[in-house]
């Protein structure tokens, strides 16, 4: 019985730690998320690759920008996804609303589960509050 109790407590601690790792210090409003971001845009995933790093893995996602509110003047943007377990899962061919910031010391664009990045939804609160944005010309 004691072993069963110890195992149950250990499992509860692991689940609590995983849940805490996926929670955000604060829930960002659309305005605050835009202010903190270097780039805010809607884009379609061209490719998403899981790459090995010294600390494990990370996702490198290339997106074709369709509409932008901040930054991302280029036609294609590469964003790295931090927090592999909790972050948005990017899939090739799907559209996303991305809030990305510059990673300190590396200068690359990154996003994570707390940045409001999400699968595109034309009726979302984010798009209503962001307004029109700048459309990219079709090639």
Model-derived segments and their meaning:
Residues 1-7:
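Sec-dependent N-terminal signal peptides
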Residues 3, 13-139:
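Transition segments tied to proteolytic processing and entry into folded domains
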